[in-house]
Amino acid sequence: MTYTTSVQTIPELGQALAQRRKLLNLKQGQVAAQSGLSQALLSRLENGQLTEFGARKLMAVLAVLGLELTFTDVGAAGTLDELRRERGGTA
């Protein structure tokens, strides 16, 4: 199973992590405990209530969710419409 998403803000990050957690049928408390965070902190992240979230904490949550961090140039991913145009109208 491949899971790819693009995020540019901390609220988008929280939403993406929540989606992945739910996809894996994990509870916030499980992910929080395994990553060394409080459930309240993970909840605030998932609900877009944080303005900062440390790299170590992020790496711990990603590990629990079976994810890794990848960097892409802004705009390099393109859109579905751009992909369709490149492929002659089908995607």
Regions found by a protein language model. Give the residues of each.
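Short basic helix-loop element that most often maps to the first helix and adjoining turn
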Residues: 15-32, 89-91
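Hydrophobic/basic alpha-helical segments enriched in Actinobacteria
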Residues: 12-13, 27, 35-37, 66, ...
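Recognition helix of helix-turn-helix/homeodomain-like DNA-binding domains
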Residues: 36-51
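A short, Lys/Arg-rich alpha-helix, primarily the initiator
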Residues: 1-23
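Residue-level recognition of specific faces of alpha-helices
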Residues: 9, 41-44, 58-61
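DNA major-groove recognition helix of helix-turn-helix/homeodomain DNA-binding modules
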Residues: 55-71
